[in-house]
């Protein structure tokens, strides 16, 4: 499976999860709906400059990991080139990183697979501890950080993490993979998906609100230029 197929399969699985509860209504009017989204009602895009949560060394290691998971190739830019490290840094500094919407007060006990991941640490804490453990392991095995390893060494270590055969947390690998995908496919206003590279890769049109002009093109490619939420503000 290549990168395009992997990203498309992720989007398809996400869509299937929402289909069961979704329903559509028919609008009788021929007039496009007014856009009521104003810039001050939207999250503000990350400003270039200093990191918000990650240290410079941590950001360097995250970039090295992300670029092995989504490397630059003929289909598009790498994860770090697409802004995925910026996306992650801002997310870890915000409510997601602090697990603001997650109950973590106990009682603590072994959960079931149906309950999903159970973690006492916040995502921000998991990154801080996970990157530290990864750095220690790389120094012990190779006398250099992950970012200093060869591509083959990096891939071998990531495969071992994913399989749970390395003395590193397989759940941390799953978190890394989840977040790099999110950064590559999220709206560019969150810092990743630069130039909407992820959306162009999978043919996603973005934040378009009215498809009536294209209803007659049944079974034909639309080839629409992606639209970001930033383009809809105002």
Task: Show where each model-derived region lies.
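C-terminal segment of N-terminal export signals and the immediately downstream linker at the start
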Residues: 1, 5, 18-64
């Amino acid at each position: 499976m290549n990168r395009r197929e992997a990203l498309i399969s992720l989007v398809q699985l996400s869509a299937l999860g929402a289909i069961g509860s979704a329903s559509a209504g028919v609008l009788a009017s021929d007039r496009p709906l007014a856009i009521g989204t104003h810039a001050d009602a939207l999250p503000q895009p990350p400003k270039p400059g200093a990191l918000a949560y990650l240290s410079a060394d941590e950001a360097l290691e995250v970039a090295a990991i992300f670029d092995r998971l989504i490397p630059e190739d003929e289909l598009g830019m790498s994860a770090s080139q697409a802004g995925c490290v910026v996306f992650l840094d801002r997310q870890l500094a915000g409510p997601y990183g602090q697990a603001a919407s997650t109950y973590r007060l106990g009682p603590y006990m072994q959960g079931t697979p149906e309950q999903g991941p159970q973690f006492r640490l916040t995502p921000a804490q998991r990154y801080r501890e996970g990157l530290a453990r990864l750095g220690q392991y790389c120094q012990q095995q190779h006398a250099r950080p992950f970012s200093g390893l060869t591509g083959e060494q990096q891939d071998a270590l990531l495969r071992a993490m994913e399989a749970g055969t390395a003395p590193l947390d397989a759940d941390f690998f799953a978190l890394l993979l989840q977040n790099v995908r999110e950064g590559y496919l999220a709206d560019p206003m969150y810092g990743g998906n630069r130039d909407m590279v992820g959306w162009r890769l999978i043919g996603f049109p973005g934040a378009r609100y009215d498809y009536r002009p294209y209803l007659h093109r049944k079974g034909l490619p639309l080839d629409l230029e992606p639209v970001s939420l930033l383009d809809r503000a105002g």
